[in-house]
């Protein structure tokens, strides 16, 4: 983990966008690949997704500890679907950042 003074809100937003993208992709992959895997094998993917959600929870906890005055809208940094209408400005910003992150994978 980087020092507290270097953990800017923008660092959290970027990490949140990346985590939301990862969870979205893994959720879709789990559904799609479950058609060719046994239930036991699919359960392994589901457990990994659960682990990632726990990591998001810890990251969110750190964010609110570092920035205690953030509004409740900032729960959207680490949580929420990427393929729906944004719920608020923070959600919209994170969705756009996730799109940029995805595009960077193809550069």
Which residues make up each language-model segment?
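N-terminal acidic leader/helix
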Residues: 2-32, 36
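Function-determining surface determinants
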Residues: 3-5, 39-54, 85, 96-106
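Acidic-enriched, low-complexity/disordered segments with a strong bias for Aspartate over Glutamate
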Residues: 6, 10, 32, 43, ...
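Generic structural signal for well-ordered, non-transmembrane alpha-helical segments
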Residues: 13-27, 43-57, 80-84
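Charged/polar positions within long, soluble alpha-helices
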Residues: 24-38, 54-68
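Amphipathic alpha-helical binding modules
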Residues: 67-107
């Amino acid at each position: 983990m980087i020092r507290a003074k270097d953990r800017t809100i923008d660092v959290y937003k970027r990490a949140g966008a990346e985590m939301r993208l990862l969870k979205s992709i893994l959720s879709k992959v789990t559904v799609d690949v479950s058609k060719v895997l046994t239930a036991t094998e699919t359960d392994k993917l589901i457990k990994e997704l659960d682990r990632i959600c726990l990591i998001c929870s810890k990251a969110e906890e750190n964010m609110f500890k570092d920035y205690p005055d953030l509004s409740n809208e900032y729960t959207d940094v680490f949580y929420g679907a990427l393929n729906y209408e944004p719920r608020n400005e923070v959600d919209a910003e994170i969705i756009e950042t996730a799109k940029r992150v995805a595009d960077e994978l193809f550069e």
